[in-house]
């Protein structure tokens, strides 16, 4: 028989999703295996994988291997001793983005604290290769803090992504428990320096709720992000990946997420996605700047013309 606490924390109905396994989804999954590529969508058990892969033509590639040197207590990605870098990975990612005809791609990476450059050179090369083969696809990067190595950050930002995403994850008080190898202030500095290096590139961060934070702490985190020129915020429900991970302390209702979004917009964020199933890459194609949106428009027009030509033939 469930305890009172377990009954309170049982997953609510609004966290149930309808799976969409259309051709886009199944084709992408097959290609990932054939190309020996990894996606955070799968590794981190993202609840939106069917919507993004099946409907929005977006995907999040995870590079620099599938094993992370850190062991954050909320994350489902494998941890341990990573493999050697795969120098052919940038080309394979770029080719896959082209074959899938993605509108928006997010390139994230495991933390590579074992590498002198934190993997920044291969990361930047991946962005460049994707851009070369896919000029109409917008590119978002989601790196770790690279151990606070700002030369590595400069290398990465020089590749000119369309969005720099670096997640604060939780409020200041909970950071040591949630992600012991990172620090709250280093995350803020990473975001600030990213904006200083490339002022025209939107910066973005994500916050999980349900770990025991208060509303006041959430608002303080919003203020800290805005004070460091962060443009975009996503807020989503923390879901426990396994019994080894941190427990969910609270399930926020859709109404509460709506209120958090309003507060964020009132505080000056240019864009905020907030909801039970929102993750840092959720609807990311809508968050790019005007230049990237124009590339989207041209790409969609080109795709429409190609489909029309094929139909006529």
From Swiss-Prot:
Cofactor note: Binds 2 [4Fe-4S] clusters per subunit. One cluster is coordinated with 3 cysteines and an exchangeable S-adenosyl-L-methionine.
Binding site for [4Fe-4S] cluster 2: 68, 72, 75
SUPFAM superfamilies documented for this protein: Radical SAM enzymes
Compartment annotation: Cytoplasm
Catalytic activity: [[Fe-S] cluster scaffold protein carrying a second [4Fe-4S](2+) cluster] + N(6)-octanoyl-L-lysyl-[protein] + 2 oxidized [2Fe-2S]-[ferredoxin] + 2 S-adenosyl-L-methionine + 4 H(+) = [[Fe-S] cluster scaffold protein] + N(6)-[(R)-dihydrolipoyl]-L-lysyl-[protein] + 4 Fe(3+) + 2 hydrogen sulfide + 2 5'-deoxyadenosine + 2 L-methionine + 2 reduced [2Fe-2S]-[ferredoxin]
Cofactor(s) annotated in UniProt: [4Fe-4S] cluster
GO MF annotation, one: lipoate synthase activity
Main location: cytoplasm
Record: residues binding [4Fe-4S] cluster 1: 41, 46, 52, 281
Enzyme class, spelled out: transferase
Pathway(s) annotated for this protein in UniProt: Protein modification; protein lipoylation via endogenous pathway; protein N(6)-(lipoyl)lysine from octanoyl-[acyl-carrier-protein]
GO cellular component: cytoplasm
Keywords: 4Fe-4S, Cytoplasm, Iron, Iron-sulfur, Metal-binding, S-adenosyl-L-methionine, Transferase
PROSITE patterns reported in the protein's UniProt record: RADICAL_SAM (PS51918)
PANTHER family registered for this protein in UniProt: LIPOYL SYNTHASE, LIPOYL SYNTHASE, MITOCHONDRIAL
Name by which UniProt lists this protein: Lipoyl synthase
Gene this chain is encoded by: lipA
